[in-house]
């Protein structure tokens, strides 16, 4: 169900080094960014727009009926781009929650986008995100898989204590793979982008640690599966296979 106080923003840029022009790469007849747009629209949680500094991305999105906000090219992170776009689209401050959906998640399930809003039902939560349980040792030990260490609040939710590329926590019990989808309260997003990069953020190369080090609360919804991001040529072929089979 759409929420008038919620906005979904998809930051997109052409600067990927491993897959040049990534947002516009063809997957089953559509640019990747359009697949992400369609998933966000299907989630039906609120209006959707793509935030970009690139005319080619804007043209592709608009050609498929999507809304675009042009942003500056010098943003240090997707969160900063999202904050600028939010200010352009909603200068009067009516939007209370903004979802930051990465533009390289063409196979994300719409219900995952809805699920990220769940933790924000608790007014004490500043930022919400998602995770899924890790089931293989390869995933547990892979430094490219970010793990959530959290205190269980319910069978479907954690309060985040830390995020790491290491294999953690120690001992028996579940480990969780972080999914890079965020929902921010508007005030939390503005506070976050005003903070300087933190020591642990720079060490782990994980932006969300800046919020934890500043005392902000991040809660994490637990979902069944991790959506496949597209970072490599192999990821791209996997996404093409998945989405071609759906058509």
Curated annotation (Swiss-Prot):
Catalytic activity: 3-deoxy-alpha-D-manno-oct-2-ulosonate + CTP = CMP-3-deoxy-beta-D-manno-octulosonate + diphosphate
Disulfide partners: none
Transmembrane segments: none
One GO MF term attached to the UniProt entry: 3-deoxy-manno-octulosonate cytidylyltransferase activity
Pfam families found in the cross-reference section: CTP_transf_3
GO BP: any one term: CMP-keto-3-deoxy-D-manno-octulosonic acid biosynthetic process
GO cellular component labels: cytosol
InterPro entries, per the entry: Cytidylyl_trans, KdsB, Nucleotide-diphossugar_trans
Protein name (Swiss-Prot/TrEMBL): 3-deoxy-manno-octulosonate cytidylyltransferase
The species this protein was found in: Rhodopseudomonas palustris (strain BisA53)
